Amino acid sequence: MGLWMIQSVRRELGEQTGTRPSFPELIAAAQEASSFAGIVSTGDDRFLAPKSMIKEVKAACKDGGKPVPATSGEVMQTIYNSLSHDYQAAIQELQSLTGKEYTSINIVGGGSQDMYLNQMTANATQLPVFAGPTEGTALGNLMVQMIRAGEFKDLADARASIKKSFTILECDPQ
């Protein structure tokens, strides 16, 4: 589900108040509620297209016997708790299926800018998170084309060029 839940809450809060909160404002609200322990399964179909993401998060908490968020900050913290928990479960499942032990997580695209989620993911997985570049999809496409055209000798060469050309932020587990 990823950042869809966050985007939906942002849109909904904007409709309620007439002013759409910024992502930094949503993060600040979540941080103020950082001790809130609500959690839901972000992969649940109920979050695909609810009329109200806020009400759906609250209902899922209630249905799961978890603390029900009362503020927008608690709703946001529930989503952050849930995403980082689900990322940790996905890493465990991936390691189990592949027999490989992963030593880090790379996050690209717009979500790589959410350093609060990146830090929570590092903490939940106990793996360092490397965030960026934000234009990961376009760069990946370009990288493949440049490898094919002989501009890079292989994937490792292309990755090294990306790493030298863009800022990649690191979040270590705490």
Q: Language-model features: where?
A:
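Active-site core segments that coordinate phosphate-bearing ligands/cofactors
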Residues: M1-S104, Q113-T137, M143-P173
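Glycine-rich Rossmann-fold phosphate-binding loop(s) that bind the pyrophosphate
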Residues: G110
